[in-house]
Amino acid sequence: MTTAGIDLQLGFETALQNLGLSPGAAHALWVPLPMLLMVIAATLGVMVMTWLERKISAAAQQRIGPNMAGPQGVLIPIADGIKLLTKEDVLPSLADPVLFTLGPILVFLPVFLCYLVVPFGQNLLISNIAIGVFFLIATSSVQPIGLLMSGYGSNNKYSLLGGLRAAAQSISYELPLALSVLAVVLMSNGLDTVGIVEQQSGLGILSWNVWRQPIGFVIFLISALAETERIPFDLPEAEEELVAGYQTEYSGMKFALFYLGSYANLLLASLIAAVLYLGGWSFVVPVETIAAWLGIPLDNPFLQIGAAVLGILMTMVKAFIFVFLAILLRWTLPRVRIDQLLDLGWKFLLPVSFVNLLLTAALKLAFPTFFGG
């Protein structure tokens, strides 16, 4: 069922028009708001993730974790932010000022731009474009340039090695990740992120793509971990080898951009996994079935609003399951070597993702009803 949902742009522009503004003026006032909403939502998500990482890491090591800044340490992300904002922004004497400054921006900006096309609920997304998946892949591919610029512009051998590792790792795993996503696109017959979720909403949990794309799902998770530089793929900033990798010479707000970009990238990958494979805002049981159990008509406004609100929570719960797993893996798996990492990407994941794509195409021709023909 397609619920009425929440259309932020339509609601905002309609409210302004009711106050007497022309449609053009109302639309002009809306244009800067998506970027602001995107930054606020992603920043809040990063704050929650940093607190979760500290508490889960503490539990894994039988520690208490942060407990001084607010109840259960919930204000520790704000304290971290204030600390980073007040630190001096140092420019090394031998660093290239242009590359050194642009690097963090090119690492941070593409991640936040990707949030423009990620649906958090029915009609609750900032920009619903027909090529949403293509936009995600194309925008995220800019990040390796920023990593290289940061490593090279620092004029530090550890930073350079970290930047080269990060770029090689990102490029190696972008291909299998893109091919695994392409298999989902093939089944949904479109690049629209909202359409992909709606294609999974027919039979509840049985309609989710994870059952039809188990191989692609595993490839996506492994590639996403490598793209976000999480353990066991955190080679670009391996402390024992490279101090802090391409971040070695950074401090203050520039370092904060790397910090924000890293966690925002993990949350983005988790949201994309929830949207592509776990049905996004779709419920485990279809809304029609729930309405029949409760004896409520489908056009009931309370059902519409409740389904929309709970759908947003459903998307976030699914996404934070992946965040939780990524944090647990940090204390479970050892770091791999650089040759093992590249071999896994080029010699195993890439061929398997090609086979998975061809298999999906064949199954779509053979079983069009089940595979989205």
Curated annotation (Swiss-Prot):
GO terms for molecular function: NADH dehydrogenase activity; oxidoreductase activity, acting on NAD(P)H, quinone or similar compound as acceptor; quinone binding. InterPro entries: NADH_UbQ_OxRdtase_su1/FPO, NADH_UbQ_OxRdtase_su1_CS. It is a multi-pass membrane protein. The chain crosses the membrane at residues 29-49, 64-84, 98-118, 129-149, 177-197, 202-222, 267-287, 309-329, 348-368. Its EC number is 7.1.1.-. Keywords: Membrane, NAD, NADP, Plastoquinone, Quinone, Thylakoid, Translocase, Transmembrane, Transmembrane helix. It is an enzyme of class 7 (translocase). Its main location: membrane. It catalyses: a plastoquinone + NADH + (n+1) H(+)(in) = a plastoquinol + NAD(+) + n H(+)(out); a plastoquinone + NADPH + (n+1) H(+)(in) = a plastoquinol + NADP(+) + n H(+)(out). Pfam families: NADHdh. GO terms for cellular component: plasma membrane-derived thylakoid membrane. HAMAP family: NDH1_NuoH. NDH-1 is composed of at least 11 different subunits. This is NAD(P)H-quinone oxidoreductase subunit 1. It comes from Synechococcus sp. (strain JA-3-3Ab) (Cyanobacteria bacterium Yellowstone A-Prime). The gene is ndhA.
